[in-house]
UniProtKB/Swiss-Prot annotation:
May play a role in fatty acid biosynthesis and insulin sensitivity. The gene is echdc3. Belongs to the enoyl-CoA hydratase/isomerase family. This is Enoyl-CoA hydratase domain-containing protein 3, mitochondrial. Gene3D superfamilies: 2-enoyl-CoA Hydratase, Chain A, domain 1, Lyase 2-enoyl-coa Hydratase, Chain A, domain 2. It comes from Xenopus laevis (African clawed frog). The lineage of its organism: Eukaryota, Metazoa, Chordata, Craniata, Vertebrata. It is found in: Mitochondrion. The keyword Transferase does not apply.
């Protein structure tokens, strides 16, 4: 059971397809396979772009504790690899993620297990901002509760026009307090509170209007547009992007004066980098930069 039922969404279709795993291996997922033999997440990597697929559509890609741990493991896998430039998080089926598995939140699991669920999830969400590479959510379908939190926590989010977003915990007696942390930092306060108080879903276009997602595209263009953005990032300097991302989140937590002080210092630091000087020289010389990622 997951948050999705409070939104009336139908069960996602069965698993299907073949996925290329890191290092060129492949695994066929048969629709008749038992769940215990099916990976909760699937990791692919090519040309510096890592795609992590939430792979449990029968359970609406619920963020159970094992799912959270699997996602975290895939994100941290060789995270310092200089060839890794972008991470994309997508999902199999017509639900991006329905949030926490409500069966794990019943009394028989106990308080300690509940704390482990929420603490592990919080570490995952904060991990996105500490990674040196951008993280993109590719959303197709419904994202509710912790699933909506996941979208809000990513650096960039591209959604299909069929996507919807909600924090419906209030309707089952469990306020979406942890999703509210990410949601409240992604959209205006009054929009966040209306979503949290009512549990009503918003459309992809409203999510774009309020800043929860970066872009909305037709469903058939979702993957190509997400890949286009990822490839564009791959054309930049790894070290410059890493510095810029870290600085952006650091300055957001500071006062206006302190933020400008920090970023002024970082701009000077950036100029001292090899790629900082290479970029300026290439612009003046009207040629493409040759990045050394240093």
């Amino acid at each position: 059971m997951s948050w999705l039922r409070s939104c009336g969404e139908r069960t996602a279709p069965a698993l299907r397809g073949t996925y290329r795993i890191l290092a060129g291996q492949s695994r066929f997922v048969n629709s008749s396979s038992h769940l215990q033999h099916t990976p909760l997440t699937v990791l692919q990597q090519e040309h510096g772009i890592r795609r992590i697929i939430l792979n449990n559509p029968q359970q609406r890609n619920a963020l159970s504790l094992p799912m959270i741990q699997s996602l975290q493991k895939d994100i941290l896998h060789e995270a310092d690899d200089p060839n890794l430039r972008v991470i994309i998080i997508s999902a199999e089926g017509n639900v991006f993620s329905s949030g926490h598995n409500l069966k794990e939140l019943t009394a028989e699991y106990g308080k300690d297990y509940h704390m482990e669920v929420f603490n592990t999830c919080a570490k995952l969400m904060t991990l996105f901002q500490t990674l040196p590479v951008p993280v993109i959510a590719e959303v197709n379908g419904l994202a509710t509760a912790a699933g909506c939190q996941l979208v809000a926590s990513c650096d960039i989010a591209v959604a299909s026009d069929k996507s919807r977003f909600a924090t419906p915990g209030v309707n089952v007696g469990l306020f979406c307090s942890t999703p509210g942390v990410a949601l409240g930092r992604a959209v205006p306060r009054k929009v966040a509170l209306e979503m949290l108080f009512t549990g009503e879903p918003i459309s992809a276009h409203d999510a774009l209007l309020h800043g929860l997602v970066s872009k909305v595209v037709p469903e058939e263009n979702l993957k190509s547009e997400t890949n286009r953005i990822a490839l564009k990032i791959c054309q930049t300097s790894h070290s410059v992007v890493a510095l810029g991302k870290s600085t952006f989140y650091r300055q957001m937590a500071k006062s206006l004066t302190d933020a400008y002080k920090l970023t002024s210092e970082v701009m000077v630091e950036n100029l001292a980098m090899k790629d900082g000087q290479e970029g300026l020289k290439s612009f003046i010389q009207k040629r493409k930069p040759v990045w050394t990622h240093s």
